[in-house]
Amino acid sequence: MAYAFPEGATFNFSSTFASAKTITALSNANPAVATCTAHGYTTGDEILLTSGWEDVTDSIWRVTVIDANSFSIQGLDASNTSFFAPGAGTGSAQKVSGWTAIPQVLTISSQGGDPRFTTIQPLAKRNAINVPVGFNPSSITLTLGHDASNAQYQTMLGISRTLSKVGFKMALSGGATSYGYGYMAVSEVPSLNNGQANTVPASLAMLGRSISYA
């Protein structure tokens, strides 16, 4: 068991993705192995993965290179063939690069990601039951110290206004790293309170899972 603390954490985004490399096969293994001709990756590269598997697609993963035409996806256990349909995981990979620091982060919070349930009550029973039907969408909200002259903040505003998708990276001081991918939204209107720094919220509405590495 280990504990992590927020002090020293860094936050980054990227809208820079290399050309897509076609994944012609994705194995039902732990970790899953991707067949991708002349991928050009090195171990530890961060990739945006698009796949027919719902729990894999639109997420950022790290790779371990096996050879010039294949790599494994760190942390992806696809051995459950009932959940990861054989042959359906094909798609593409794009290397993520050009990480940009998110400036003056004061707080971070997450929303959603919790299970959704539907309540069912058969007529022959007095006791209703909750049946799981999936998960609520996930999002992350950061509170930033407002500085309209900050170049990174201006870049974030541009991404927000054009409804562009970005990668998100949170690195803790102990080495753990979490990734996300989705739409970035940044406010231009600061909040003002006596005795406190002016702030603006920035949020990321994630399209896929948040993937974490120790």
Question: How would you name each of these model-derived features?
Answer:
Residues I129-A148, Q196-I211:
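Oligomerization/assembly interface segments of phage tail-like spikes and tubes
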Residues A2-E7, S15-N30, C36-H39, W53-R126:
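Small/polar beta-strand repeat architecture
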Residues K169-A214:
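Short beta-strand and beta-hairpin "edge-sheet" elements
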Residues P31, S139-T141, K165, Y179, ...:
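Intrinsic-disorder/low-complexity, polar/charged segments enriched in Ser/Thr/Lys/Arg/Asp/Glu/Gln
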Residues L144-G175, A185-S187:
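Acidic, glycine-rich flexible loop segments
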Residues T37-W53, S160-G167:
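Short coil-to-beta transition motif at edge beta-strands of beta-rich domains
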Residues A124-I129, S187-E188:
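Short structured motifs
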